[in-house]
From Swiss-Prot:
Catalyzed chemical reaction(s): (6R)-5,10-methylene-5,6,7,8-tetrahydrofolate + NADP(+) = (6R)-5,10-methenyltetrahydrofolate + NADPH; (6R)-5,10-methenyltetrahydrofolate + H2O = (6R)-10-formyltetrahydrofolate + H(+)
GO biological process: L-histidine biosynthetic process; methionine biosynthetic process; purine nucleotide biosynthetic process; tetrahydrofolate interconversion
CDD domains listed in its UniProt record: NAD_bind_m-THF_DH_Cyclohyd
Name of the molecule in the record: Bifunctional protein FolD
Protein's job: Catalyzes the oxidation of 5,10-methylenetetrahydrofolate to 5,10-methenyltetrahydrofolate and then the hydrolysis of 5,10-methenyltetrahydrofolate to 10-formyltetrahydrofolate.
GO molecular function terms listed in the Swiss-Prot or TrEMBL record: methenyltetrahydrofolate cyclohydrolase activity; methylenetetrahydrofolate dehydrogenase (NADP+) activity
Binding site for NADP(+): 166-168, 232
Classification lineage: Bacteria, Pseudomonadati, Pseudomonadota, Gammaproteobacteria, Alteromonadales
Metabolic or biological pathway, per its Swiss-Prot or TrEMBL entry: One-carbon metabolism; tetrahydrofolate interconversion
Documented EC number(s): 1.5.1.5, 3.5.4.9
Length: 284
């Protein structure tokens, strides 16, 4: 068996095209164009790349994109004050603060300062709580994008044994909630998990988000399983690889996401979807 590739790049492009059409329709109807504020603190190269991609995607679909680049030395109070002003700005539907933040700024305090109806990253405790209560509104972007990828396979998720490897607030935990909502029997694995191999080998669906190249051997993948690889790791030779040993895993899986071109583009597409949702549901 050779896995079918889940083409995140193509699916994300399709989403952006639909969003662009909706923005055009809003303009023609005399409605306001959705606005996204992107805040970057410091000059971390990886963060700059991510932020650049998000700004470019905004422009492609016709959103208003406002950029706020702050110095690494920016105080927590300065950042919170900026968020307060964006919360009150009627032209802004979504506020994104690029993580991680410098050590002197508390991530959770910043996330909680963003108004829940403008939390297009889906990180605010209110929005995570809505997902946990099975009434999601603004959903965490990477898990939301992954669910779109899984749906594209046409596989019925109800009753699947799913394993999520990684328990971060950004991916692992909300991913577990998304899979529960989709009817999966879900196991979340983390650094204290025993018998990881045993759990992976019986999984119908595996989502891996640990940030370690080739962390999951391909031979662990159950024949016919769906593999979603969230990891994006740069090797010394410059090659980008995921958290799963791709070549062997692709021989066992029925569907697999490539790295790059799998989950990454979907995270940004979901961010754009959330921004339009916020405009339509909360701010029109």
């Amino acid at each position: 068996m050779t896995a079918q590739i889940i083409d995140g790049k193509a699916i994300a492009q399709s989403i952006r095209t639909k969003l662009s059409e909706k923005v055009t329709a809003r303009k023609e109807a005399g409605q306001r164009i959705p606005g996204l504020a992107v805040v970057l603190v410091g000059a971390d190269p990886a963060s700059q790349v991510y932020v650049g991609s998000k700004r470019k995607a905004c422009e492609e679909v016709g959103f208003i994109s406002r950029s706020y680049d702050l110095e690494t030395s920016c105080s927590e109070d300065e950042l919170l004050s900026l968020i307060d002003s964006l919360n009150d700005d009627p032209t802004i539907d979504g506020i994104l603060v690029q993580l991680p933040l410098p050590a002197h700024i508390e991530d959770s305090k910043v996330i909680e300062r963003i108004r829940p109806d403008k939390d297009v990253d889906g990180f605010h405790p209110y929005n995570v709580g809505r997902l946990a209560q099975r009434i999601p509104v603004l959903r965490s972007c990477t898990p939301m994008g992954i669910m779109t990828l899984i749906k594209s396979t046409g596989v019925d998720t109800y009753g699947l044994d799913a394993v999520v490897v990684g328990a971060s607030n950004i991916v692992g935990r909300p991913m577990t909630l998304e899979l529960l909502l989709a009817g999966c029997t879900t196991t979340t694995c983390h650094r204290f998990t025993k018998n990881l191999e045993q759990k992976i080998r019986i999984a119908d669906l595996v989502v891996v988000a640990v940030g370690k190249p080739g962390f999951i051997p391909g031979e662990w993948i159950k024949p016919g399983a769906i593999v979603i690889d969230v990891g994006i790791n740069r090797l010394d030779n410059g090659t980008l690889v995921g958290d799963v040993q791709y070549d062997v895993a692709a021989q066992n899986a029925s569907f697999i996401t490539p790295v790059p071109g799998g989950v990454g583009p979907m995270t940004i597409a979901s961010l754009l979807e959330n921004t339009l949702y916020a405009a339509e549901q909360y701010h029109d």
